[in-house]
């Protein structure tokens, strides 16, 4: 099995690569072009929606273009998200986080387009999920990994399961489901 660590490998990132989605996209694209005729499993993790909250400029202003404060979304600003923060600063930090989500969404779209370009959409199961959400003082706390509130665990799970490999039963549900059951089922498809 070929594997590689993307995003957190300093040798691949270079010195000034704050936004990892372009690098991830390029490396995944190269891998898919080399391997698209073989059966494959690929796990792609877009890291950009993790701290710092500093999306590229066009996304930084997307949800809060009138902000005049000093918060830029860097770690020092993130550390100041605590009770007592000014409402406009908190709104701006949430807007930066949302900007990062929108930025990564663009790269998920590029992955979809690449799968389509390589004629893989009709025989590839594609699962899009978030590893966690983020709490922004909804319960007087910030970050993730410390509670089980909806802000942290109510995350997207989108499954593209094409007709070519779909079994006899097919349904859509908005109920909670178990990854313990979903992953073995999908890997047998």
Segments and roles (model prediction):
Residues 1-189:
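Catalytic domains that recognize anionic headgroups
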